[in-house]
């Protein structure tokens, strides 16, 4: 990795085929993840004296879709403040004007690993239950503001070695409006809910299906519904859970209904058969958590008909989860989204670019005026946020998360990993 000087405020790092032009306060950059939305580096923030993750968005103004996702992610990250949502620490661009603006950097908390790695561990009921509880708290916080994540998957959920969990990546998150008809290609295939696969309208509990898939993966150690395309994905679901009833079929669009009704009929399997006791850890003595409770929760999450699927609120009160219940976490005040038309907006690339640039300048102005607490004044076009600089342990400490080099690399996440085991719950 080579390093050269650009100007008095910024340093340049060559990271693979990409160039990171970052504030001098960010040192020792090291690539830790890459994906369609960007490249992520771990770095040390000399001002905050902590390790952070810096995400450079890949060609944010390549087209309208990329630009809209970049705007959505930035706006939502600026608004959300919850212990189970990844914290935004800084936003900056090295360019000095709208005309020059082309690179966007987002600085986040650095975590130790994602659930792809955690799933490979031998988790006891306490850890499994506590991780689920935190997922649900984060999701409820988003839903309280009408935000549907839509892309929940193991690589978008990160953890610290002390079992603290955070949800990240808001590039596909959507504010819930009056219409819920959306493309079926918004969620990584394996975790797509039936209503998404079948092009139906959907609401907040689309995220609950994804959580159920993740829980099932924790138990089995492998993907539940590994479809090769969206048709095969549907087949994988009904082969295990059974063909839905006529009542559900009536909700489908005529062409989709014809296809679904012409598929072979499957009786499905009971959850006792799909998830036998042998797959679970030993029953917990401390919190009285049992395989039967986890299986019951799973059976309420993995319900094909969304109208009969468990809600986030009810899931938080389920016996397998409510041992951790804390109103400060589960009932945190909803984030205030200033842009009520966040998803209805349609703009040209240049208009999106201007909107994003204004968000960066707004952040800078808030930092200057002390609205964003605990941070020094920004340099150049850089802006800094300390309001969410949580007191989580530095990633420079010896981490106890285990990793498997054969696992797929995380996509666009803020994590760093090292070998070991997952720490205790609170």
Swiss-Prot record:
Catalytic residues of the enzyme:
151 (proton acceptor)
Enumerate the cofactors the protein uses: Mg(2+)
Q: Where does ATP bind?
A: 33-38, 55
**From which source organism is this entry?**
Xenopus laevis
**Which segments does the entry list as coiled coil?**
none
Annotated GO MF terms: ATP binding; JUN kinase activity; protein serine kinase activity; protein serine/threonine kinase activity
Q: Look up keyword Ribonucleoprotein and say if it applies.
A: no
| Gene Ontology CC | cytoplasm; nucleus; synapse
Q: What's its job?
A: Responds to activation by environmental stress and pro-inflammatory cytokines by phosphorylating a number of transcription factors, and thus regulating transcriptional activity. Regulates morphogenic cell movements, controlling convergent extension during gastrulation. May play a role in the regulation of the circadian clock.
Query: Where is the motif (TXY)?
Result: 183-185
Q: Which residues carry this modification: Phosphothreonine?
A: 183
Q: Name one GO biological process term.
A: positive regulation of apoptotic process
* Family that this chain belongs to: Belongs to the protein kinase superfamily. CMGC Ser/Thr protein kinase family. MAP kinase subfamily.
The record's annotation in PROSITE patterns points to: MAPK (PS01351), PROTEIN_KINASE_DOM (PS50011), PROTEIN_KINASE_ST (PS00108)
Enzyme Commission number: 2.7.11.24
Does the record's keyword annotation contain Nucleotide-binding?
yes
Q: What is this protein called?
A: Mitogen-activated protein kinase 8
Expression sites (tissue/organ) = Strongly expressed in presumptive ectoderm and mesoderm regions and weakly expressed in endoderm regions during early stages of embryo development. Expressed in the head and dorsal regions during neurula and tailbud stages.
Q: InterPro entries under this entry?
A: Kinase-like_dom_sf, MAP_kinase, MAP_kinase_CS, MAPK_JNK, Prot_kinase_dom, Ser/Thr_kinase_AS
Q: What is known of its domains?
A: The TXY motif contains the threonine and tyrosine residues whose phosphorylation activates the MAP kinases.
Report the catalytic activity: L-seryl-[protein] + ATP = O-phospho-L-seryl-[protein] + ADP + H(+); L-threonyl-[protein] + ATP = O-phospho-L-threonyl-[protein] + ADP + H(+)
Q: Which residues carry this modification: Phosphotyrosine?
A: 185
């Amino acid at each position: 990795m080579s390093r050269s000087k650009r100007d008095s405020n910024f340093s340049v790092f060559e990271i693979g085929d990409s160039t990171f032009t970052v504030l001098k306060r960010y040192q020792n950059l090291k690539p830790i993840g890459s994906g369609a939305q960007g490249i992520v580096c771990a770095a040390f923030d000399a001002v905050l004296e902590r390790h952070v993750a810096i995400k450079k968005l890949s060609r944010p103004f390549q087209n309208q879709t990329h630009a809209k996702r970049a705007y959505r992610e930035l706006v939502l990250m600026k608004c959300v403040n919850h212990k189970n949502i990844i914290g935004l620490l800084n936003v900056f661009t090295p360019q000095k004007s709208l005309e020059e603006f082309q690179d966007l950097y987002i600085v986040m908390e650095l975590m130790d690993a994602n659930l792809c790695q955690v799933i490979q561990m031998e988790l006891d009921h306490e850890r499994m239950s506590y991780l689920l509880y935190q997922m649900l708290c984060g999701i409820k916080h988003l839903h309280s503001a009408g935000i549907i994540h839509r892309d929940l998957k193991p690589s978008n959920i990160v953890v610290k070695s002390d079992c603290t969990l955070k949800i990240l990546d808001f590039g596909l998150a959507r504010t819930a409006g009056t219409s819920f008809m959306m493309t079926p290609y918004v969620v990584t295939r394996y975790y797509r809910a039936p209503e998404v696969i079948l092009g139906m309208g959907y609401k907040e509990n689309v995220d609950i299906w994804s959580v159920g898939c993740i829980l099932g993966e924790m138990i089995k150690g492998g993907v539940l519904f590994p479809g090769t395309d969206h048709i095969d994905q549907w087949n994988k679901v009904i082969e295990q859970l059974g063909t839905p009833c006529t009542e559900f079929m009536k909700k489908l669009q005529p062409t989709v209904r014809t296809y679904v009704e012409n598929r072979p009929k499957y009786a499905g399997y009971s959850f006792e058969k799909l998830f036998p006791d042998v797959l679970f850890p030993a029953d917990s003595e401390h919190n009285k958590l049992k395989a039967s409770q986890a299986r019951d929760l799973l059976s309420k999450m993995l319900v094909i008909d969304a109208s009969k699927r468990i809600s986030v609120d009810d899931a938080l009160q389920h016996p397998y989860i409510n041992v951790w219940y804390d109103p400060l976490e589960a009932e945190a005040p909803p984030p205030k989204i200033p842009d009520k038309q966040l998803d209805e907006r349609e703009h040209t690339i240049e208009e999106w670019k201007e909107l994003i640039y204004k968000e960066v300048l707004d952040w800078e102005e808030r930092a200057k005026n002390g609205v964003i607490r605990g941070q020094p004044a920004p340099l150049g076009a850089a802006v800094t946020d300390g309001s969410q600089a949580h007191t989580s342990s530095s990633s420079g400490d010896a981490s106890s998360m285990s990793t498997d080099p054969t696992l797929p690399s995380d996509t666009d996440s803020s994590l760093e990993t090292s070998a070991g085991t997952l720490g205790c719950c609170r």
